[in-house]
């Protein structure tokens, strides 16, 4: 036994609570005893928040093996259960203690057989009384790994552990005794990550026509010689092959709307001609799905096409929206004080993961899904780019960005597995001109309308306007973090260019009309501030007035059509439109000025400043378009209807609590 691990272990299930000192048999205790012992000394446990929930004691803390596993084995899959821990660490399975006296025996089995990742079968038959001993064995195995010279995740561990020790991470004291300082100073995380390289544009694909027989032969190669012959699948592949034929007229691509019943095997039915065409023509085929589950299935299916792993990673790229990937600039801010207390511990563990992650995908990638559940406030959303704040080339980590890595990999891939939302975003914002898809297969096509509606629809809401204010003005009051306003992001322009500086200042003044912190409380109290809050208050009153369900206290959102509106609401909409226009004008002027500075650069415009301006132009254009859409929407309140749009008023609620309108 490792002397520094002389801590008791605790396991709580729905049926019992088991407690054990190292080398001692487990004893069954009550909830009150468990809480008292947790207050006396740190306890080794697995999934502390879950144990706290079962004990009914939310303040429970201790030595959580999941956190230690995330530190020792970052980016490694592990089911967060006792048996999942056994399998991940290749432990021998402890059976119940037997014998008596002061020296009980611990019977061990041989290593477990390989099971499915979920490990349901392995959980059966494991006595709960043996789990505390299992937790002790797992803790010893993890701590012993820190001393192994062949530990593959050693780099960065010492630096990370010192930071965690300053944060009083419960495991820091034990781990520090077993992790030696490196002989040479460790490299900073952001200097260790690989950079992507600019690649020449992929040549235009060759114009070829796929023969039906070739598509069928490719299907047979993918399904294997012993597979069942399904005529429906073969017909699907033969028909799908025709959409890859050369165009006959400009702007009229070949299209096919195909439906296949359950059991036809449509996935391989379209993968066969798609992979055949991409290989023969030297082009890229995008396969768009609606769900992450189908993305994962497609990734597994395409492994049949490229048996070699290196070739597979080169030829097949999975693309997701920006909000799925770790933003390195957000992570740097979190590591340098943007996160506090337990959130700061999460940031350090995410940094450990980032150094070894395959692609930086935080949602459905190799970041353990259970890691973020160990921390009360969800910090993951703050580590991704969910607000469109990316400054692109103006970011100091641009060359190492996970999102840019994926974008450039997809430009030379044969198959890109994306989702409807990303395809719609690229279609709407048209940022990735070089890698824009020219051949697209929409699987789960019945969801395509929802994805398009989500992207191309516009919503003038309290939360959206708050985000716009923050984007222009930056953090206000006690707000922390790297979020900066226009003046800070474009400090060079604000300082050295008179016209640009005026536009930035005018935008800042105009943005004060948008809702700020506490807007929802002010509206509820009947004291809205500014033109937009006045409009939102009028909308709220109208929605409640027209609700005929009598369910004002129900937990569901409320809606009403935008028709037969009263005078005060129309007047509030006109005032709000003027406020939106007042912000739109200086942003348009700023956009024009930035383009002039790029075309005719002044002496002060060095490389970094140019990169910041180019990044700002992209995000500025998006905000200008959004403001114009808001103005158009407000113009239809009390004005003529537009047959191309369906407009309505809504109050968003969850469990009876209003959160937007």
Briefly describe each language-model feature range.
Residues 436-456:
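SF2 helicase catalytic motif II
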Residues 397-407, 418-436:
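Conserved RecA-like ASCE ATPase "motif II neighborhood" in helicase/translocase motors
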